[in-house]
Every structure is written in structure tokens, then in C-alpha cells.
Amino acid sequence: TSNRLMLRANVSPSTVTGIEVSGQDQPFGQNAYSRTSEQTYRDVAGTAQDTWSIGTSKVNEFRFQYARRGLSYFYNTQIPGGSDPAVNIPGFAYFGREPYSYIQRIETRYQFTDNFSLSVGRHNMKFGGDVNYLPLTATFTVNYGGVYDFGSFGAGSLGFVNPAPNSLPNFPDLSPVQSYGAGLPGSFVQGLGSPSDKFKNIPIGVFWQDS
């Protein structure tokens, strides 16, 4: 008999800043720097494998893997305005906190795999199994920072009614920029409640083959 042991480790960090998002009708080119976001990955993985040869006709392979992925998606933390409530002025400007931020997710994997190979006469058989345990936690705070939408605002909504519509022009409506200057949002959206959740997944697989 003989044994061969293999160990492997991987680390993969990544950080991307200045991301422009087009969700919720945000067109590229109209997002201010404060509306950009940043995404961070921190991936770590390790594997240990033992290959056990038993005589000339039997081989057992056992492998354990641990892997962890940490994901963070945040509003712009480089300037104070990145955490302010989001302001949408369609056709003109989008600034303040990115509505989809922040997101935090951690996925961990524990994997156990064992395969046994056996040669008997003209048959080469192999069977084994695989068990995974994957706990996951996630936080998703869409619109939790608050979103103000500014659009056109009718003059009639402010009490400006044309007393003689047949002879006098109507009062002009406020443009989205004028509505923002007047502090008159058309809507306000705010996410509420617990944004966090956690769950686990346990996939199990077995196989047998003969050739």
C-alpha cells in the first residue's frame, strides 16, 4: 500500500470602485460620483486530498474542501454624500446613496468526497459519494437609505388655477429641476424591516459505475 497526500490553498481578493448602476432607470452618464458604488470579494479556499493505493487493483481517494466567499456591495464610502438619501431627477441627475446598497453575503462550503476504485477481472468499478454543507448569510438593504424622486409638478397642485383659461395662458408646470429646487418630490421610497436572512443547503450525491 501507498499514500499520496495533496494540500492546496487559494486566496483571491478583489475590490472594484466607481461602479455605475443602471437599475431603477438610472442612465449611465447622469450618475454623480456619490451615486457610484464599490464591490469587494474575499475568496478563500483550501483542499486536502489523500490517495490510497491498496495493492495493484484498489485505490481510494478522499478529499476535503473548505471554501468561503465574502461579498460586500456598498455605496460610495469615499465621500460623505455617498451615504445621503438618494435623489433622482430623471433626465438631469442622480446623486446620493446607490439604492441597491448595501449588500453583504457570506457563503461557506464544507465538502467531503470519497471514491473507491476496484479492478476485478475485466471489470473496472468505481463508486463513491459526496456531501456538502453550505451555510449562507445575506443582508440586502434595497432602498433602505431612502429615495426621493423629482418629476414635473403641476401648477394646479400648488393652487395656481387659471381664472380665465379662454383668454389667459395656463400657469407653467415645474420642471424636475425646479421641483427639486422647490423641495417638492413626487414620491419617497424607504425600505423597512429586517434586511438579513440566513439558511443552509446540504447537497448529497452518490454514484456507482462499471466499465
Go through each PLM region and give its residues:
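Short acidic-glycine motifs
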Residues: 1-211
